[in-house]
Structures are given as structure tokens and as C-alpha cells.
Design a protein with these regions (language model features):
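Active-site loops and adjacent core secondary-structure elements that bind or stabilize anionic groups
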Residues: 80-295, 299, 320-322, 355-356, ...
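Alpha-helix capping/termination and helix-coil
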Residues: 14, 38, 42, 278, ...
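A structural micro-motif
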Residues: 47, 71-72
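C-terminal substrate/ligand-recognition segments
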Residues: 293-315
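Short secondary-structure boundary/capping segments
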Residues: 34-37, 63-68, 90-91, 174, ...
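Structured, hydrophobic secondary-structure cores that serve as assembly/anchoring elements
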Residues: 309-391
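Short acidic-hydrophobic, aromatic-tinged amphipathic segments that line or gate anion-handling sites
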Residues: 73-78
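Cofactor-cradling patches in redox/metallo enzymes
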Residues: 1-66
Length: 400
């Protein structure tokens, strides 16, 4: 959403507060630019701003962005903290007795400039990391793509991360004072009963349309590039990934056989969706001002898409022959203690959203009702994509 559209809507609807959520790494830059635009338009004093999302941290918002914004800017960890902040901001704005904002996060003590320069001096060039290149390459069951539709909720519901849902999406937590029920008690008395009710409703109202398109492709790597090959062994498409400039100097390309080895590796891609109906239902709730119901159903829909992605990644590991290495405990599965990893576009190791167009060209996700917008966003919203890597050392990392 361009900032001009946000500001026009704020003026048209006489908004009290502007809220923005950033999921992707690029969002940190966009948020800063948006706040600077509010400054330039002399609108900062009129609009307090609440920021949140996976790409942002409280320190970044309440330290760095607070320093540049000429109005009030605060961080909300989730939608429920956002609602509490809204109450506080409105109370302060209207002069309600006793209304006040929570304290800003205090700035950390920074190292001296000289020490920081030595510590942060990056290495240059394409110096490869120490990732092993002699791991066995699994044999995929097929090359190309397959479409799977009609996946039942019971098949992937066990992959639903209740902790991420209850804490991250629904804001379920014990009172800060320590009084009242514990988090575990809240899970039993509120979380799981609400979850069961919503899951029953999703099935009764037929709101889920879970589907997957995925595939395996031959590939090699060269420097920071992953080169996907066609059936004749010629280059089909190429992904260029960022490399860490310090530490292990990891790059996603390192997890595939280098071109000079003469060997061919295999890479997986997947796009999953729980369909558009659940998004349409959340939109109805929002339009009817049923905000808590909206937040709960929307949060569940996001986590169900993630559960489907995890379920299908497990299917890929089975097809590649190493599902036996998966941990037995479900919490260890949620902690990603299995072999390999799936990397979604827009995050630290592969931040370039434009690469989604390359995945879309190979998988043709429109076959399961998923489309790519001009801004390289997946629609329906409750959809995810991923590069699936089999290498035993492949784990999440940030290339920044």
C-alpha cells in the first residue's frame, strides 16, 4: 500500500491513528520512508503511528524510528497490544484523566565508533562459506511439478503451532501482575476451546480449500547464484542470493553442488494455500466491526497456512528419503530440528520478492488459485511459497 493511499484514507476517514505492519525485511526501509513522508507533509503531529509485524523490533521502532519521526510512534507486538495502544493514544489525545502511554524502550549503550568499525568491517567478494559439498544428493521421485487439491484439515491440523497461535496471534498471556490464571490455564480454559470451535466452524461452513503445487528441479550453484536447469541441463532460471558479510559468510547458493564439481543437485519449490474463502470470511468480520472475531479468525488462517506448509515440507522430506531423521517430539518439529529447511521469499536469506516471479513461472500456482500481484504479493493472503533445501546444514540465517 503506497503511503499516499494510506494518508488519503486517513484524511478521508478522519483517522485518529495510523497503523502499519511489516512482514518482510524490506519493510524496515519502507516504514522509515513513510514516516519521513509524514514529516515532510507536516502531518506527524496529527497522526500517532503504531508499527508492528515480523520484520520490525521494538528497539528499531522505539529507538531509531522514534528519533526521526516528529510525532508519536510506538511498536505493537501483536494486534492485542495494538488495541491497548490505541486506547492509550486516544485517551491522551482526548485528555482523559490518567491516560498515558507506556514508556519507550531505552536505548542500548552503543560501542565506540572505532570499536564498531573494527567489529563490523565486512569482507568483500564471493568467498564461499564452509558449508559441506560432499553430502549425498537425494533422488527425487519425479522432476517437474505436481498439483495436490482437496487436502483435508485433519491431514495438517497436527502441524498447527498452538504456541504461535495463542501467544503470537491471539495475545494469550498471564497478567503482568502475576495474578489470575497462568498461561497454561488460559490455554486450557480459553485457547483450546476457542480453537476447537473455530476449527469446527471452518469445516461446517466449508471455508478451507487447502491445495499445494510443488516440484523438484535439477540445479547447480555458482558463487552467490542458484542455477535451475531444464531437462537438457541448460540454465532455465537463476536466483542470486545475498551473502553474509561476516561470520560464516553463508549464502543459500552454498547449500547446492557447485557448478565446477560436475555434479547436479536438486532443489524443491512449493506454494501452498488454504484458499480464498477464509479470507473472504475475515473481511466480512472486519467490515461488521467484529474486530476480536476478525483477529482470531485471521490469526488462525495465517497459522493454518503455515501448518499446511510444514505438513507439505514433511511430505517432501519423506519423498526425498530422509523423513526418518525427523524428531519424534512435535515441539522439536516446531523448533525446526529436522533435516533441511524451507526458505520463504522476503526474509533474511532470500529478501528479493521479485524472485517470486521465477517460482511462479516454474510452478504455475494459478492452478491452485494463487496469483502474484504487481507488488509480488501472493493472493489469497493465506498462501506461502518456499525454496526447499535438503542439505543437512541448511538452517535459517540472516544475510544482512
Amino acid at each position: 500500500q503506497p503511503v499516499s493511499a494510506i494518508l488519503e484514507a486517513a484524511e478521508e476517514h478522519r483517522a485518529d491513528v495510523i497503523g502499519m505492519s511489516g512482514l518482510l525485511v524490506k519493510s524496515t526501509v519502507i516504514m522509515k520512508e513513510n514516516l519521513q513522508e509524514l514529516n515532510q507533509r507536516k502531518m506527524a503531529a496529527d497522526y500517532p503511528v503504531i508499527l508492528g509485524g515480523a520484520a520490525l523490533t521494538r528497539a528499531y521502532v522505539e529507538q531509531d524510528l522514534h528519533e526521526i519521526y516528529q510525532g508519536e510512534v510506538r511498536y505493537a507486538r501483536d494486534a492485542f497490544e495494538g488495541l491497548r495502544l490505541m486506547d492509550a493514544l486516544i485517551g491522551v489525545k482526548r485528555g482523559v484523566p490518567g491516560a498515558k502511554l507506556p514508556e519507550l524502550k531505552q536505548r542500548r549503550v552503543r560501542p565506540s565508533a572505532a570499536a564498531a568499525e573494527v567489529e563490523e568491517r565486512p569482507q568483500e567478494g564471493h568467498v564461499r562459506s564452509d558449508v559441506a559439498t560432499d553430502n549425498p544428493v537425494p533422488e527425487p521421485p519425479f522432476e517437474g511439478t505436481r498439483v495436490i487439491k482437496g487436502i483435508q484439515l485433519k491431514e495438517y491440523a497436527s502441524w498447527l503451532d498452538e504456541g504461535a497461535l495463542f501467544k503470537g496471534q491471539w495475545g494469550l498471556k498471564q497478567a503482568r501482575s502475576g495474578d489470575g490464571p497462568s498461561y497454561e490455564e488460559l490455554v486450557e480454559t480459553e485457547g483450546r476451546p476457542r480453537l476447537r470451535g473455530l476449527l469446527d466452524r471452518l469445516q461446517t461452513d466449508n471455508l478451507l480449500e487447502a491445495a499445494v503445487v510443488y516440484g523438484y528441479f535439477p540445479c547447480v550453484s555458482k558463487d552467490d547464484d542458484l542455477i535451475v536447469l531444464d531437462e537438457q541441463g541448460n540454465e532455465r532460471t537463476r536466483f542470486t542470493f545475498p551473502r553474509q558479510r561476516r561470520g560464516r559468510r553463508l549464502c543459500l547458493a552454498d547449500f547446492f553442488r557447485p557448478e565446477e564439481s560436475g555434479e547436479t543437485d536438486v532443489v524443491g519449490f512449493q506454494v501452498v494455500t488454504v484458499g480464498s474463502r477464509i479470507g473472504e470470511e475475515t473481511a466480512k468480520l472486519f467490515a461488521s466491526d467484529s474486530y476480536r472475531d476478525y483477529l482470531e479468525l485471521h490469526g488462525l488462517s495465517v497459522q493454518l497456512a503455515e501448518a499446511l506448509a510444514e505438513y507439505w515440507h514433511a511430505r517432501v522430506r519423506a519423498e526425498l528419503g530422509f523423513a526418518g531423521e525427523d524428531p519424534a517430539d512435535v515441539e522439536d518439529m516446531f523448533a525446526l530440528k529436522y533435516r533441511g529447511a524451507r526458505f520463504s521469499l522476503g526474509y533474511g536469506a532470500c529478501p528479493d520478492l521479485e524472485d517470486r516471479a521465477k517460482i511462479a513461472e516454474m510452478l504455475r500456482p494459478e492452478r491452485i488459485g494463487v496469483h502474484l500481484s504487481e507488488e509480488f504479493q501472493l493472493h489469497p493472503e493465506q498462501s506461502t511459497d518456499a525454496i526447499v533445501i535438503h542439505h543437512p546444514e541448511a538452517k535459517y540465517f540472516n544475510a544482512r
